[in-house]
């Protein structure tokens, strides 16, 4: 195991994350717990495959006297990067949901004569709820695609990882 190039493990892990993101992008409002479970296994596998080679590559060229500081900076940057991506993902979901809701409700108005039928009054709330569900689903799909794209964008950067010559 120690003879494997860490770039192989990182590449494999990020490719699995890309597959996981694309799998999540195929979710719809009728997604089952099985779909979520399969995807959770994929993501767990990916993170497990990425973590050890990433840590090995990070500390391979670090002198032992800098190990404590290097570890602190490594974990700080990892946590900071995760937090930033989570914040951007939540922002993408919220903005995308609002944009799609507005787009889907453009022609649905009290002033639209085609919809001014007295028997439709009770359906307005149900219609608004369904449009909200669909808009939110589009928002989540956009975030899942961004997750897959971010995982894919990391792949060329793995080529920059260098291990010390032994």
What positions do the PLM features span?
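Intrinsic disorder in cytosolic terminal tails and internal cytosolic loops
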Residues: 119-120, 124-133, 161-166
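C-terminal module of multi-pass small-molecule transporters
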Residues: 1-107, 136, 140-165
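Juxtamembrane non-transmembrane "cap" segments at the membrane-aqueous interface
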Residues: 98-124
